C-alpha cells in the first residue's frame, strides 16, 4: 500500500518521524512536503498533492496529512472526489456500551482513506499509536456502509 504524507510547518517535525517509522515497518511512503521547516508555508500546498494522489486510487492508497489542528487540512482534502479524510486527536472511546475507538470506526464504517492529524495535540508516541491503529483497521465491507458511501460518492452539487 502506498501512503502519501504531507504537512505544513506545524506538523513538519512529527511528519519526518512518522515517515521514518512507517518506512521501517515496510510501508511505501511518498513524501509530498514540506521538505523543510518554513513557518510561513501554507497547508494547502502540501495537502492538495496528497489528496490528489489518494483521489486517483481511493481504495489502494492512503494519505496522512498533518497541520496544527488537522481541521483545515481535512477540509481541503475532502474537496477531492472519493477522498474520505477524517480528523483525529488521539484515543477517544464513546461513553455508551461500545469499546471501539473513533479511529477504528472511521475505517470500519466510513472507509476513511486520509487521516488528518492535529500535530499540536499529539506526542510522537500517541501519533504512532493512532496511525498504526488506523492503518491496520480494515473497512468492514458491510452492505449498509457500502450503500452509504455510494450515496456520498453520488452527491452532485448544482
Question: Predicted regions: what is each one?
Answer:
Residues 50-89:
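Helix-adjacent hinge/juxtasegments
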Residues 28-40:
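A short beta-strand-loop structural module common to alpha/beta enzyme folds
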Residues 40-52:
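Helix-loop module immediately N-terminal to the HCX5R catalytic loop
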Amino acid at each position: 500500500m502506498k501512503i502519501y504524507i504531507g504537512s505544513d510547518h506545524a506538523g513538519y517535525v512529527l511528519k519526518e518521524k512518522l515517515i521514518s517509522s512507517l518506512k521501517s515497518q515496510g510501508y511505501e511512503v511518498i513524501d509530498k512536503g514540506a521538505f523543510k521547516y518554513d513557518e510561513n508555508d501554507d497547508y494547502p500546498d502540501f495537502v492538495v498533492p496528497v489528496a490528489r494522489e489518494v483521489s486517483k486510487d481511493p481504495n489502494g492508497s492512503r494519505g496522512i496529512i498533518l497541520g496544527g489542528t488537522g481541521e483545515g487540512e481535512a477540509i481541503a482534502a475532502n474537496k477531492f472526489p472519493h477522498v474520505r479524510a477524517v480528523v483525529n486527536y488521539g484515543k477517544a472511546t464513546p461513553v455508551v456500551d461500545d469499546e471501539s475507538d473513533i479511529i477504528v470506526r472511521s475505517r470500519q464504517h466510513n472507509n476513511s482513506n486520509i487521516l488528518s492529524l492535529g500535530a499540536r495535540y499529539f506526542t510522537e508516541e500517541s501519533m504512532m499509536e493512532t496511525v498504526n491503529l488506523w492503518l491496520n483497521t480494515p473497512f468492514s465491507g458491510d452492505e449498509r456502509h457500502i450503500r452509504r458511501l455510494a450515496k456520498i460518492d453520488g452527491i452532485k452539487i448544482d
